[in-house]
UniProtKB/Swiss-Prot annotation:
Its EC number is 5.4.99.25. Belongs to the pseudouridine synthase TruB family. Type 1 subfamily. This is tRNA pseudouridine synthase B. The active site is at D48 (nucleophile). HAMAP family: TruB_bact. The gene is truB.
């Protein structure tokens, strides 16, 4: 008997998932996509299986704006285990070295200012970065170590929350591309004892905070109670991740031409930069960029939600 193909729903929006421990970002995405029965889905930057916390999941038209969330600043809380280093930089790796820990809270607090602001990081071998089409983590698992170029990132916030024995809890606010494992390893080396990430929780992704998230258990319960459509109440608007951008309103006439690819003028447009665009009915219709001549050029358009 031929298998009946599942007809997926055309739904759009963002679900803020509190990613559970042990899930890859893609596994979490596919689980929620199945519960929602969504046609199109994508996430906005990977969290390691060891990590939990804010993972924006984009569905339908919202996937067109996932790159802008990927580029946004992030916030984390991490537990730094001092006295050991591992081959992965976290608790899942093999211990490479064990050293005595002779530092305390005062030593850590005195050191942290060195790691605030613009810093240089060498990405870890256990990362999704690619070399000749191969992810570095696959090369690392095969025992290979390749040279990686240092990259500049910015640490906007770095505070010591707790320190007990050989463990310290840190609060970190950082730019895109920051590796918390590398940050913790570098701090450990500067302390002279080595360190790895024992726990990691993302508390912020762009404008989204942990308090706004929903758990996988809550989504599963909603699905059990009411099916796919019961999850629609957890969907945020497709432009939720762009709330810091100016909103420009177009007349019915201008919106028609803008949606057909033409740059138009708007009286409330800023002088430059990226903007959200809505039509005369206050319906979000896409994002645009204000050019030097003051016109708004369409960059990504969406279908009606």
């Amino acid at each position: 008997m031929a298998q009946v193909k599942r007809i997926r729903r055309n739904v759009s929006g963002i679900i803020l998932l509190d990613k559970p421990l042990g899930f890859t970002s893609n596994a979490a995405l596919q689980k929620v996509r199945w519960l929602l029965n969504a046609e199109k889905a994508g996430h906005t930057g990977s969290l390691d299986p060891l990590a939990t916390g804010v993972l924006p999941l984009c569905f339908g038209e919202a996937t067109k704006f996932s790159q802008y969330l990927l580029d946004s600043d992030k916030g984390y809380e991490t537990v730094m285990q001092m006295g050991q280093t591992t081959n992965t930089g976290d608790a899942e790796g093999e211990v490479l070295q064990t050293r005595d820990v002779t530092v305390g809270r005062a030593d850590i607090e005195a050191l942290l200012p060195r790691f605030r602001g613009p810093i240089s990081q060498i990405p870890p071998m256990y990362s999704a970065l690619k070399r000749d089409g191969q992810p570095l983590y696959k090369l690392a698992r095969a025992g290979e170590v390749v040279e990686r170029e240092a990259r500049s990132v910015t640490i906007n916030r770095l505070e010591l929350l707790e320190c007990e024995g050989t463990r310290a809890r840190l609060s970190v606010g950082c730019s895109k591309g920051t590796y918390i494992r590398t940050l913790v390893e570098d701090i450990g080396e500067a302390l002279g004892c080595g360190a790895y990430v024992a726990e990691l929780r993302r508390t912020q992704a762009g404008p989204f905070a942990l308090a706004q998230t929903v758990t996988l258990e809550e989504l599963e319960q909603a699905h059990a109670d009411g099916g796919n459509e019961a999850l629609d109440r957890f969907l945020m608007p497709s432009d939720s991740g762009l709330q810091d951008w100016p909103m420009v309103s177009l007349s019915e006439h201008s919106a028609f031409y803008w949606l057909h690819g033409q740059a138009v003028r708007a009286p409330d447009a800023p002088q430059f930069g990226m903007v959200r665009v809505q039509d005369h009915n206050a319906r979000f219709i896409g994002i645009g960029e204000v050019s030097e001549d003051g016109r708004i050029a369409p960059r990504r358009l969406i279908r009606s939600e």
